[in-house]
Amino acid sequence: MPRIISISMIIAVMLQSMTACGQSARAPSTEDTCADDAPAVALTAEEAALYDSTVGVLLTQELWTDRDIYDTAHALMVPMHYAFAAGDMEKIDAFAAFFDRFAADVTGADQYSFQEQGALNRLQFYYFTTQFMVLCAESGCPEKVPEGLLPMIEPQVETVFSEWPSNWKSEPTRREHFYQVLAGKQYPYSYYSIIDDVDMYILAILCDLGVYRQKTGTELTAVETEAAEIAYKLLASPLLNEETENGGWVFQRGVWWDHPNFAYADYQAILPDMEPKPRRDVTWDSSHFTRMAACIISWRNAQPTQKRYALIEKRRAQLATQFASEICKKVNGYWLATTFIDGTNGVFRKYSGYENSAHILIGWWSLLGDVRIRQIYTEILKEFPLGANRDTNPYFDFATIRDQNPFYDADTGYDLGMYQCMVMCASKLPCASRS
């Protein structure tokens, strides 16, 4: 809920300090239930071994390298949320040790050239980091956050917000881009007006830092306050948001229609000698929009008033409905994703309809905290083991061919158990979204 100082908040903080990060007031449930107030489901001995042999091993590695930085934030986000939801001190401490090493290196020698990474890679990893910071603060253990993280991340992301040009240089700064899009500016290409994944992360990181400052009793910066307001305005704007008849939600419909990646969106499958055939009403591809499932919670939790909080909470619930009823479909016994978030299929990049479903397995959709989504992940978990080939595994990502960590690479990650672990954690998160 919005953070209004009250006696109840003071009591909550006292109780939180008594439960000290690992000893949750409510222990993880051993039953696979999904009531709205159900806690995280505890791992069996076999499941705990899977977690340790995947996430536990990864957290001993320096994952902010050029090879691993992008994938790590995707793959470890939900296992990290599970650790805190379950109140598992051993797992939380493993993440704390990982971020200790990260902070020491990046604020020191920067041995792996993290600071030279591109904007999306760094921001995605920074978002993973600020989520850790917020989870620590919410769980009553802010002392586990390395001291160097806030002074490193905050000025960098504020600079990106205030000084870096928008994508395609449509505006001189990201800040200006937000306001021009809200004002309905007409661009030479429709996709110039997109609020892209970098924009989502910028606002989410700044919102996280604002929540962290509130939780730790320090004053928000002006940019953090502004970022929360922009996030609200983006989700409130009638120009950008469409509520569907079944209670779902679509963001910026049609904005991508003239982008090259969407040039063949009106084909259901890749055909030889295709000519461009775009769709004017095309929506975000579901793979990239999975990031909104996490970012929308960060945006919501930073809101200072009940009105603004309630609007973004409404969008969260609508996005959960959109995923559960339109995006995620049962196809030949598997839960697969439609190409686009309006529930339609088409050709996107190298994928035909339902072929770009690997994003479901990283589990970010589960962060929406919805009963229906948790049930979907419970059913997907029963599909394992899944093979490391396209013929027997409909989630297999055949299009990503860059060098990857063996735990993240589709050729090896299924056999090593990483994909199963991500789905397992997603199936056991609490149904009520974090507030």
Language model features with spans:
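Bacterial N-terminal signal peptides
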Residues: 8-17
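Extended HEAT/HEAT-like alpha-solenoid repeat tracts in very large eukaryotic scaffold/adaptor proteins
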Residues: 125, 194-205, 284, 288-291, ...
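Short, solvent-exposed segments of well-ordered alpha helices
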Residues: 62-67, 113-117, 186-197, 276-287
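Bacterial N-terminal signal peptides that target proteins for export
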Residues: 1-8
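Terminal, non-catalytic domain-edge segments
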Residues: 29-58, 131-181, 205-215, 226-233, ...
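N-terminal carbohydrate-binding/catalytic regions of secreted carbohydrate-active enzymes
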Residues: 52-127
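Acidic/His metal-coordination segments adjacent to aromatic residues that form catalytic metal sites
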Residues: 103-112, 181-188, 252-281
